[in-house]
Amino acid sequence: VAPLAGGVYGGEPDDLSMRAAFPQLWELEGRHRSLLLGAMRARKGRGSREGGSLFFSFAEGLQALTRRMAEALGERVLRGTPVLGLEPVRGRWRLHTPKGALLAEAVVLAIPAPQAAGLLRPFLPEATALLKGIPHTPAATVSLAFPGALPVEGHGLLVAKGEGLRARGFTWTHRKWPGRVPEGFSLVRAYFSGEAARLSEEALIRLALEDLARLLPGLPRVHRAWAFRFPEGMPAYRVGHLDRVERLEMALVKAPGLFLAGNYLQGVGLPEVVRSGRRAAQRALAHLSLGEAHGASR
């Protein structure tokens, strides 16, 4: 479990809420009294997988989805327009931006917890404190392009603590997403978290190359390297996280028409984040419908 906890959350399993961070493992352990036994029975029940792929994305990356959504919505989307402030105004919400103020009947804050806390601080101190109490660990990725084919199998690996490597894991991108890599090249992505993720881009690239060289002796000279750092990249689901989320939802009752969505609530994976967004949208629509019904009854 430790490599999984480090690769996904950048932390140690002793610090995490298993029920919040890995609900499937929690369910397996509770049902079968053993993670190993539960995994074996679950695999046996699924049988063999026929055809298809374990992974799905867009040919141009996930940015293709947001770009297409913005194009479809047209002028209703204000791109490159940060929200500088938020305040309740007689049952509605005023959003302050560099382009002026906007008035809305409902607001969904689909932003990281630290930024959401900053917007809520003037009028929701309890929710602000709960959001600030969700720790975020720094994360970084390093992409390395090599000429030729590297001697790797599968789609990557997670690194166990004590192996002497600084990276938390590696993805063989040319095998996982073959359409994104030019023919004749291999592409590897390394993942870092914690203090290592705070290093400079040059230092991160050096560490990634050193770790990869230990795993793959005779590594060819890197053709190109990119490093990306995310100072508050990953929320950590510490023990008591689900209770914190429940208290956060109760605190938002004082702010009708305001809803939260994001990876710091009930899952960091894309499926969980999509569900979080849908849940917030459904609640916002229900709030708007209630307002319309109330107005019609006057």
State what each model feature region is.
Residues V1, T128-K132, P217-A225:
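Short, surface-exposed acidic
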Residues V1-G85:
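Active-site/ligand-binding neighborhood in enzyme catalytic cores
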Residues F58, P135, Q266:
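Nucleotide-sugar-dependent glycosyltransferase donor-binding/catalytic pocket residues
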Residues L73, A104-E105, A255:
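Short, well-ordered alpha-helix to beta-strand connector turns
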Residues V77-R79, L109, L260:
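A structural signal for the hydrophobic beta-strands that form the central parallel beta-sheet
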Residues T81-L215, E249, G295:
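Mid-domain catalytic core of redox enzymes
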Residues G169-R298:
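Conserved flavin/dinucleotide-binding core of flavoenzymes
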